[in-house]
C-alpha cells in the first residue's frame, strides 16, 4: 500500500494542503479574492454613478438645446413680425410721401398755369393798350384829346392788371 505511486501522490497532496492550511494561505487567498470583489463592486458603483451623472448631463444639455431652439424660433418669429411691421410702416410712409409729392407737383402745375394765364393776360392788355393808343392817336387831335386818351389808357391798364 505504501509502495504505490497513487499513495505517494495522495500523501503529497494532503501534505501540500496541510502546509497551505498551516500557513493560512486560504485566508490570504480569500482576503485577496474578497478585496478584488470589493474593488470590482466599487468600480461598478462608480460606473453606475458616472452613468447616472452622464445621463443627467445629457438630459440637461438636451433641455438646454430644446430651450435654445425654442428661443431661436421665437427670435425668428419676432424678427418676421418686426420686418412685416417695418414693411407696413415703410409702405405707409412711401404712400404719404408720394401723395405729398403729387400734391406739390399739382400745386406747382396750377401755379405755373396761373402764372402763364396772368402773363398772357398782361401781354394781351399791353398789346390792346398799344393798339388802342395807336388808333386813338391817329384819330384824335394832338391837344386836349391826347390827355384824355392817356388818362383812359392808364385807367385801362390798371383795371386789366
Swiss-Prot record:
<dbReference type="Pfam" id="PF00430">
    <property type="entry name" value="ATP-synt_B"/>
</dbReference>
<dbReference type="GO" id="GO:0045259">
    <property type="term" value="C:proton-transporting ATP synthase complex"/>
</dbReference>
<keyword id="KW-1133">Transmembrane helix</keyword>
<keyword id="KW-0813">Transport</keyword>
<keyword id="KW-0812">Transmembrane</keyword>
<keyword id="KW-0138">CF(0)</keyword>
<comment type="function">
    <text>Component of the F(0) channel, it forms part of the peripheral stalk, linking F(1) to F(0).</text>
</comment>
<dbReference type="InterPro" id="IPR050059">
    <property type="entry name" value="ATP_synthase_B_chain"/>
</dbReference>
<keyword id="KW-1003">Cell membrane</keyword>
<keyword id="KW-0997">Cell inner membrane</keyword>
<dbReference type="GO" id="GO:0046961">
    <property type="term" value="F:proton-transporting ATPase activity, rotational mechanism"/>
</dbReference>
<protein>
    <recommendedName>
        <fullName>ATP synthase subunit b 1</fullName>
    </recommendedName>
</protein>
<keyword id="KW-0375">Hydrogen ion transport</keyword>
<comment type="function">
    <text>F(1)F(0) ATP synthase produces ATP from ADP in the presence of a proton or sodium gradient. F-type ATPases consist of two structural domains, F(1) containing the extramembraneous catalytic core and F(0) containing the membrane proton channel, linked together by a central stalk and a peripheral stalk. During catalysis, ATP synthesis in the catalytic domain of F(1) is coupled via a rotary mechanism of the central stalk subunits to proton translocation.</text>
</comment>
<keyword id="KW-0472">Membrane</keyword>
<feature type="transmembrane region" description="Helical">
    <location>
        <begin position="1"/>
        <end position="21"/>
    </location>
</feature>
<keyword id="KW-0406">Ion transport</keyword>
<dbReference type="InterPro" id="IPR002146">
    <property type="entry name" value="ATP_synth_b/b'su_bac/chlpt"/>
</dbReference>
<keyword id="KW-0066">ATP synthesis</keyword>
<dbReference type="GO" id="GO:0005886">
    <property type="term" value="C:plasma membrane"/>
</dbReference>
<comment type="subunit">
    <text>F-type ATPases have 2 components, F(1) - the catalytic core - and F(0) - the membrane proton channel. F(1) has five subunits: alpha(3), beta(3), gamma(1), delta(1), epsilon(1). F(0) has three main subunits: a(1), b(2) and c(10-14). The alpha and beta chains form an alternating ring which encloses part of the gamma chain. F(1) is attached to F(0) by a central stalk formed by the gamma and epsilon chains, while a peripheral stalk is formed by the delta and b chains.</text>
</comment>
<dbReference type="GO" id="GO:0046933">
    <property type="term" value="F:proton-transporting ATP synthase activity, rotational mechanism"/>
</dbReference>
<comment type="similarity">
    <text>Belongs to the ATPase B chain family.</text>
</comment>
